[in-house]
């Protein structure tokens, strides 16, 4: 009888462990799928209205585009070349006023937008934008200091002098009247993403549902597609990792993300 009890206890324990392990595994293997593209945009760099820095940065980026450096970084971080900046060798030499070396600029960036821009454990920043900014700094003989800001507050941050420019995964379309923008340097689409096991297969099927976003550009994409009037509510999350965690947990029904980084999270 004792042997039978021990055997039954062993079987019960083994079954419980199996259920726990398979339960954990199911959470770890959650997958996602894109069901719609909402809009297209081009990422820009934002400056104070009329600031000559805009022309200087644009010229430096045109030279880096001509050198193939932007294409290289795009392929390295995103797997595809999404570059749209004009390639113009010697663009800096065409400026009426040449940039003086030795300047130190404060650049407003986003955090938590891997692999575009995110902080490391040591407090430094890594990703496509910081690497490209470093190439611009080397070309101009300048140094850059990065400051994390909210992409919805770009005009205010520039106007206060807190930053010299804002370099983010954003088109700044909502701020174009109050800031100067470089030409677009990277193409992007906003995508609507759901869990792969979701019953939602089209954007129209999300009527009355909860959509997760990270910033105003994603909200603009919802408005441009006409979805803002159909969904139940829109919830803001701190970054894309938080967005996907909420989607995986079922806290929201879909998320709007930048298509260029979808492969990193999906």
Predicted regions, residues:
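Extracytoplasmic small-molecule ligand-binding "clamshell" domains
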Residues: 53-80, 94-173, 177, 213, ...
């Amino acid at each position: 009888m004792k042997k039978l009890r021990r055997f039954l206890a062993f079987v019960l324990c083994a079954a419980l462990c199996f259920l726990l392990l398979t339960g954990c595994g199911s959470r770890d293997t959650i997958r996602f799928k894109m069901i719609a593209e909402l809009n297209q945009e081009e990422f820009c760099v934002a400056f104070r209205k009329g600031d000559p820095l805009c022309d200087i940065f644009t010229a430096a980026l045109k030279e880096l585009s001509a050198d193939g450096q932007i294409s290289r970084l795009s392929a390295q971080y995103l797997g595809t070349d999404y570059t749209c900046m004009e390639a113009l060798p010697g663009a800096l030499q065409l400026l009426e006023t040449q940039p003086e070396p030795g300047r130190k600029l404060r650049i407003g960036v986003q955090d938590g937008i891997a692999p575009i821009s995110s902080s490391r454990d040591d407090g430094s920043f890594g990703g496509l934008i910081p690497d490209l900014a470093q190439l611009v700094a080397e070309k101009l003989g300048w140094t850059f200091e990065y400051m994390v800001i909210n992409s919805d507050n770009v005009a205010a941050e520039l106007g206060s002098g807190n930053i010299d420019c804002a370099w983010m995964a954003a088109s700044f379309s909502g701020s174009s009247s109050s800031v100067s923008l470089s030409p677009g340097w990277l193409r992007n689409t906003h995508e609507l993403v759901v869990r792969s096991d979701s019953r939602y297969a089209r954007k129209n099927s999300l009527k009355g549902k909860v959509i997760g976003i990270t910033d105003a550009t994603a909200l603009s994409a919802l408005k441009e597609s006409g979805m803002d009037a159909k969904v139940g509510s829109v919830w803001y999350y701190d970054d894309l990792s938080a967005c996907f965690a909420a989607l995986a947990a079922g806290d929201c029904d879909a998320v709007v993300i930048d298509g260029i980084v979808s492969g990193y999270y999906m």
